[in-house]
Amino acid sequence: MMVYSEAGGVSKTTAAVSVAMTAAEAGHRTVLIDLDPRAASTKWTRIAPVGEGLHVGAILGAKEEPTGWAEDLAVQSTWHPLLRVIPSARDLSNRESDRDDYAELRLKTSLVDLQADVVVIDCANRQGGPLTLSALHAADRVLYAATASDSGVDGVTGAQRTVDTFRRSMARLGAAATIEEAGVAMTRDGTGFLSYAEQDAIDQVRELAPIIEPIVPHLAIVPEVRMAGEWYGAYRKGAPIRDAYTEVMRKVIR
């Protein structure tokens, strides 16, 4: 499953990491793939590649067929024994200029024989391009991430447009696009009453795609633990967020 928005600052990485971690806590063997050159998931989970340059960019830039490489590059997380991470790096951006034939299929090919029940892809906030295409080919579902804001609405709108374009392109080729929309993981500030602007944004997003309840509160502990490389669910103050994402995870993970 890919977690996607075309806007920045809409809790996309928080959603991806949270769904992956709560899936592991629920007993699923989980692999989180950081497909964003910002490497936010990688930095948060404090994951280092198994060797120099052996991050997700090695898969996307492979000159030979990378069958099964994901299993080799997935690194065990210290957060949970059932969570592994395929890290990213800034030079992943070099892959965005890659025009090799079938380059967009390398990530999907690498997942062959991966020992995992759940794969979560933290996507870059791109309007298409090789990184997004790689995720679209590899994933069977897309979970949109949004905040209750104008940026959240714009991010979902753009992401849906990209997914629709991908589906139409596959149809023109006579190939089935298997990716489905799982819905929207929605975040809002705090736990108090919704402001008019927040409610308006939520209503606009709901017209685009189903919002997966509950709406997740964004609390100060999230940026604090991200700086420390820790899981907010290990702290009492993080319980409301963990519980909300656990419910979201149960609704989107098959």
Predicted regions: what they are:
Residues 1-254:
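P-loop NTP-binding core
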